[in-house]
């Protein structure tokens, strides 16, 4: 029987958890929403899974037991503080990880093919105890009881959560979004993509994982589009490598606030090398739209100020649908790198993912063939 969101958070409360930090997954959309108004357990939206684990460890050091909620596709981000902080310092933290792409790789998206099957083996190799929470298995209270002696011994305990083990309840999005004086009719992601495509000619376009890539694919698929599936937070770095390798071409990055927050240090690298042929478009709707509309921390983050301080030559803030196309035109005429922060709203058509029609390897190969004129094939 699936665990309801309220039962999930109640179980955490009953087991003494006093703080939860995490990165959203649709498997946990309901519990994260429930935590938003739970009086005794603050929820800390983390930039990435590693910072979530570190935050939980810090809470435990201060005497407040803590838990982490994460998607298995972000397990790689979590490995570093797991192996260099939590394990060597023997800090007991409870970690919930969704098992996308498990038990069959075909049950998830392409980026879950590898991580979906290796998390239990990796935990075994690190001698980290883990339990499964299944729709037809022992309930959450029983599973958490099994973690008590593990945590009491100073070790982390992992609960791997299968699809359907927690009820798929509608997540509640961000509260009223923060706006600035002069903000107008905010675009949704489809409005943004439509405006960008109206101005793009020979440019190469990288789009971040999630609904932005779906919107780009459904509105204007072409070989010069690279659709990220997974690798959240790395699209700007991917584009930077191409921009430095091919200075005669122009590159556009379609990014999101959650993605930029995940690895925001990449902005300083882009600013340091300052490729003049890079236009970085950041769609800031202040939610993780692809996982159910959970709030990011972007409402208190001034991306334009950060980009200026990181060395971007040009930074512009746009907050109306009508202003997007002129801003793209200005960016194409100017020397980059440009960061165009587009204050947007949640919503837009979900659409089909690109890999439903074009395989992930083919996305890379056709893009590279266009970029290198077929002279340096990937394989």
Predicted regions and their residues:
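Thiamine diphosphate
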Residues: 1-240, 244-249, 321, 348, ...
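Short acidic/polar active-site loop segments enriched in Thr and Asp
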Residues: 18, 65, 276, 313, ...
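DG-centered beta-turn motif at the end of beta-strands
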Residues: 73, 249-267
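A short alpha/beta connector and helix-capping loop motif
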Residues: 83, 91-93, 263-284
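Active-site regions of oxyanion-processing enzymes, predominantly non-cytosolic
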Residues: 155-160, 336-342
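Residue-level marker for buried hydrophobic side chains located in beta-strands
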Residues: 205, 251-254, 281
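A contiguous pocket-lining binding segment that forms or flanks enzyme active sites
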Residues: 277-317
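A short, acidic, amphipathic alpha-helical segment used as a generic capping/interface helix at domain edges
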Residues: 320-333
């Amino acid at each position: 029987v699936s665990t309801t969101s309220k039962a999930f958070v109640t179980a955490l409360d009953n087991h003494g958890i006093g703080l939860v930090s995490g990165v959203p997954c649709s498997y946990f959309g309901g519990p994260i929403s429930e935590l938003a108004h739970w009086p005794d357990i603050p929820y800390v939206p983390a930039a990435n899974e590693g910072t979530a684990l570190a935050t939980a460890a810090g809470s435990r050091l201060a005497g407040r037991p803590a838990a982490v909620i994460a998607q298995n596709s972000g397990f790689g981000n979590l490995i570093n503080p797991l192996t260099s902080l939590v394990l060597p310092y023997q800090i007991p933290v409870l970690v919930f990880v969704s098992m996308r792409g498990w038990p069959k790789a075909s049950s998830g998206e392409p980026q879950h093919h590898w991580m979906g099957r290796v998390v239990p083996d990796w935990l075994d190799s690190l001698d980290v105890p883990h339990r499964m929470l299944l729709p037809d298995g022992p309930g959450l209270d029983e599973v958490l009881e099994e973690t008590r002696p593990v945590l009491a011994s100073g070790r982390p305990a992992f609960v791997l959560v299968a699809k359907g083990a927690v009820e798929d309840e509608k997540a509640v999005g961000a509260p009223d979004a923060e706006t600035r004086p002069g903000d107008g009719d905010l675009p949704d992601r489809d409005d943004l993509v439509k405006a960008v495509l109206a101005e793009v000619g020979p440019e190469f376009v990288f789009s971040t994982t999630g609904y932005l890539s779906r919107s780009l694919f459904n509105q204007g698929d072409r070989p010069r589009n690279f659709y990220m599936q997974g690798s959240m937070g790395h699209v700007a770095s991917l584009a930077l490598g191409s921009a430095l390798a091919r200075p005669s071409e122009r590159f556009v990055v379609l990014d999101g606030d959650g993605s930029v927050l995940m690895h925001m240090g990449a902005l300083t690298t882009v600013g340091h090398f300052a490729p003049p042929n890079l236009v970085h478009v950041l769609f800031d709707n202040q939610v993780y739209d692809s996982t159910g509309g959970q709030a990011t921390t972007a409402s208190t983050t001034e991306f334009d100020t950060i980009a200026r301080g990181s060395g971007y030559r040009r930074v512009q803030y746009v907050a109306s649908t009508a202003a997007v196309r002129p801003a793209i035109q200005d960016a194409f005429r100017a020397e980059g790198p440009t960061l165009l922060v587009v204050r947007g709203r949640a919503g837009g058509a979900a659409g089909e993912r690109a890999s439903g029609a074009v395989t992930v390897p083919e996305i890379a190969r056709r893009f590279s063939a266009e970029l290198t004129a077929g002279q340096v094939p990937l394989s």
